[in-house]
Design a protein with these regions (language model features):
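Hydrophobic beta-sheet segments that form the core/acyl-binding groove
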Residues: 68-104
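A structural signal for beta-strand boundary/capping segments at domain termini and interdomain linkers
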Residues: 108-109, 127
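Hot-dog-fold acyl-thioester-processing enzymes
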Residues: 2-64, 121-163
Length: 163
């Protein structure tokens, strides 16, 4: 990643809504929003050195501790989807990321996903610090993203507001 690319939200490869992902309402089923967010996060993890190549070495991996998805607009079969990731915060063991899912052609925001990831030592299956090289990349990305606007949906809590 170049310094210029660091300052913008991280762009993931475009994806297309597949036929098998459409439910009886005729739109992308809620579970597949998670699939798209998860598979797109793999691209960011690969660039940070904590993706599949790292995980299959058996030393460490990233687990999801919490995720919150907001469904804002429909996606239909065949729609191309663009997903971006923004680092909201990070420390030695945790990575707090926020994703925006857009209809690639029409540009509207279809969904957001806020996620807390924890780095895990696969031998002990306990939280452990990121590898040093990855930690440096995460810190650089977090610093570059610090100037981005905080997403409107970040930090939301589920509940019914009572008067």
């Amino acid at each position: 990643m170049t310094d210029t690319a660091l300052a913008a939200p991280f762009e993931c490869p475009l994806r297309t809504v597949e036929h098998e992902w459409v439910d009886y309402n005729g739109h992308l089923n809620m579970a597949y929003y998670h699939v798209l967010f998860d598979q797109s996060l793999d691209k960011l993890f690969n660039d940070l050195g904590i993706g599949w190549d790292y995980t299959k070495q058996g030393e460490g991996s990233c687990f999801t501790a919490e995720v919150h998805v907001c469904y804002l607009d429909e996606l239909l079969e065949g729609d191309e989807v663009r997903i971006t990731y923004q680092v909201l915060d990070a420390d030695a063991k945790r990575l707090h990321v926020f994703a925006h899912m857009y209809h690639a052609e029409k540009g509207y925001l279809a969904a957001t996903s806020e996620q807390m990831c924890i780095h895990v030592d696969m031998k002990t299956r306990r939280a452990a610090p990121f590898p040093e090289a990855s930690q440096k990349k995460i810190e650089a990305l977090a610093k570059a993203h610090a100037g981005l606007a905080r997403p409107e949906q970040a930090g939301r809590v589920i509940g019914i507001k009572r008067k």
